[in-house]
Amino acid sequence: MLSESSSFLKGVMLGSIFCALITMLGHIRIGNRMHHHEHHHLQAPNKDDILKISETERMELSKSFQVYCIVLVKPKDVSLWAAVKETWTKHCDKAEFFSSENVKVFESINMDTNDMWLMMRKAYKYAYDKYKDQYNWFFLARPTTFAVIENLKYFLLRKDPSQPFYLGHTVKSGDLEYVSVDGGIVLSIESMKRLNGLLSVPEKCPEQGGMIWKISEDKQLAVCLKYAGVFAENAEDADGKDVFNTKSVGLFIKEAMTNQPNQVVEGCCSDMAVTFNGLTPNQMHVMMYGVYRLRAFGHVFNDALVFLPPNGSEND
């Protein structure tokens, strides 16, 4: 009898462990079981099509785009924080910094946790609860990321925010396709709405990734969004080049010089790039100079659209 009881207890323990593993793997593999969705690549609008739009409609389009920027920071990032605050975030319609703790040097929203997934969850909930009626696109980035917000708005020009968009640089991990946080993550207001509805459902969007191992915050986000029927989309220009980049422009140039020495510019990156990552504070300011301040005398830029800065903005 004792032997049978011992065998029974061993069976229960092994069964429990097996069920836990299956549950965790289920979070990663839910795409095939719950939803049928074939990943596709989204491209920026054609410039010729934009030129066909009347000037009045173009002005209305440029005014209608409202992008709210979320930057996740920690106290150790203070020099990067300062650079981001002084450079590209001025071009967001509104930008706020979400920190792991109170930092006296800069204004931020305290998430009171060092866990990046919890920070991301709390930041998205805060943004949705407070700004769901003001902004239709939400862009999240690391403090090592440089973003050209005007290029982001151009890319989103013909995309309906009432549809569930989840955009950026996609990466595949097993059966899970997710947008890498290194290149920045874009969610439409519809995706924010669906995500917000799942944040309080631990069975579908848990605060912790698992009992045995922990997955990164961008993978956690993809798991939650899959349950909401929202899937990762890779953002590209008309030539199929990525516009959300997980590396710095300097690294891309070095790679192009090695791999395509006769076509460095063509082999580097998209003319309509939205983000680059892995930048130092000094590189942020150099990028700002190159993107917004340097101009060739006598050269006229014939942009079909002009995205106006928010009222009171100090952007370049």
Curated annotation (Swiss-Prot):
Picking any one GO molecular function of the record gives:
glycoprotein-N-acetylgalactosamine 3-beta-galactosyltransferase activity
Q: Which UniProt keywords apply?
A: Chaperone, Membrane, Signal-anchor, Transmembrane, Transmembrane helix
> What membrane topology term does the record carry?
Single-pass type II membrane protein
Highest taxon of source: Eukaryota
Q: Keyword Transmembrane helix on this protein?
A: yes
The membrane spanning regions, by residue number, are 7-26
The main location is membrane
Q: Which residues lie on this side of the membrane: Cytoplasmic?
A: 1-6
Query: Ranges in the Lumenal compartment?
Result: 27-316
Name the GO cellular-component terms: membrane
Q: According to its UniProt record, where is this protein located? A: Membrane
Q: How does it assemble?
A: Associates with core 1 beta-3-galactosyltransferase (C1GALT1), probably not with the soluble active form.
- Tell me the function of this protein: Probable chaperone required for the generation of 1 O-glycan Gal-beta1-3GalNAc-alpha1-Ser/Thr (T antigen), which is a precursor for many extended O-glycans in glycoproteins. Probably acts as a specific molecular chaperone assisting the folding/stability of core 1 beta-3-galactosyltransferase (C1GALT1).
Concerning PANTHER family, the annotation shows: BETA1,3-GALACTOSYLTRANSFERASE (PTHR23033), C1GALT1-SPECIFIC CHAPERONE 1 (PTHR23033:SF2)
Question: Which family does the similarity line name?
Answer: Belongs to the glycosyltransferase 31 family. Beta3-Gal-T subfamily.
Q: What is this protein called?
A: C1GALT1-specific chaperone 1
Q: Which organism is it from?
A: Rattus norvegicus (Rat)
